[in-house]
Amino acid sequence: MDDKRVQFWVLYLTRFAEGFGFITLITLLPYYINSLDPSSTTVLGITISTGLIIGLYTTGFTLAQTVAVVPLAWAGDRFDKRLVLLIVLGVGVGVYALFPVVDSSASFIAIRALQGIAVTGTGLMTLSLVGQIADVGTRANYIGKANAASFGASILGSISAGTLYDAFGFGPIFLVIVCIMVVAWVGTFWFLNPDETRIEGFPFSGLALNRRILTLSTFRFQYAFAVTLVRTWVPIFAGVSAAEGGLAYGGFAVALTVVAEKFTNMCCQPFTGRLSDGYGRALFVFAGGAAYGLIALVVPLSPWLGGVLGFPAELVVTVPGVLAGSTLPAWLPYDSITDQLVLIGEVSPAFFPLVFLSGLLGIADSFREPASMALFADEGTEEGGVASSFGIRELVWRPGSVIAPLLGGWLMVEVSMASVFYVGGAFALTGVTTFLVILVRFHGRSALLEW
């Protein structure tokens, strides 16, 4: 196995570790809301509503990411990206070990902020190294594979988080995450070559005025609101109580709504990344973003679709006679195997449409993401600052990722659960419209196929 291939596999492993930890917290978010029971409070004479506190559960994470982007990206270009990656992975190990001690909204928000720094650093360094090691004509393909590793972790993380939470609570979940992070750290230390590139000065200043990056940013700025709202509120919609506008599903059912998007995205990204290398990346950004917005508008209609189509409220399978009645170990939540096994129970007919729509969201985004990342990597590599180009990409995303959870929390409490998805879908559609207009106006009609 050649040295470059080994390095790609190590970086895929690191993306796996990052994705596993990140999605676990997304999956568990509705249960932290139920467990911590946030309520309005007054700080320095300013009243913070329940909806804003719920929003801070995510905004604490994204705000820390925003603060961390520039120094981490600068450090990656100025010094050894491998060393920076090892440091942020070590921080991640400590952060996930702290989650079991959470006992209030304040402590949860604070630890989520630390998680944001670890996730941002890991993502920036792994993607920068993948883009740097890969050849120009194959970047979207390799980035798609790296993202597929992250989505694979998201699938396992969602299922294991929901299942372990239902059986044991929060504690054991984070032990699993810590072990995976340690394995990733060891693999990075032993198998990833030191990065010898050094960029003097401050590459952000030049890349910030790059015409292609500015054009992409007009779309990405708006699209960040869409994805943050939709991805965050699909599991919240599935898991919170009906009184709060949700469907009140159990942990495993909520996990499946998250897994559906990750699974389809994971399966498609290596293929769509390869296609975008050959047929034009701007076209894939536009098509994927538009499809995502349209699908998001349909998500609140899941209960209506389930009722019209007559979907069942549970999924039951018959157990073979040789297994029925078998005694299970004492540490499992059930004593024995019954003659019928309820795979998914206590859900409404909305469940299957919601899972299907979540899967469609993953397919739509699989067209956009590797193409977008490859475009930023191309510009960064040509101008000598690939970590900084990904840093700009992250910075453009940050306003949406910080403000959208607060907006979503307010909409959920003050307007309706459905309004969160309508606003999210609208942001995606205005984003692709702006992108197309600017692309054609300033770069020509052929740019949609040539980029």
Functional labels for PLM-detected ranges:
Residues A146-W190:
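Helix-loop-helix hairpin linking two adjacent transmembrane segments in secondary transporters
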Residues G55-A73, L256-F271:
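Central cavity-lining transmembrane alpha-helices of secondary-active solute carriers
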Residues V67-D103, S276:
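Conserved MFS/SLC helix-loop-helix module at the cytosolic interface between two early adjacent transmembrane helices
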Residues T27-G51, T232-F252:
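Short amphipathic helix-loop junctions that connect adjacent transmembrane helices
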Residues L83-L98, V178, L283-V298:
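Structural signature of the two symmetry-related core transmembrane helices
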Residues D80, V101-S107, A118, G280, ...:
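Helix-breaking motifs and short loop linkers at transmembrane-helix boundaries and internal kinks
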Residues C179-T197, G431-L439:
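C-terminal membrane-cytosol helix-exit motif in multi-pass small-molecule transporters
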Residues I111-G152:
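Cytoplasmic helix-loop-helix junction between adjacent transmembrane helices
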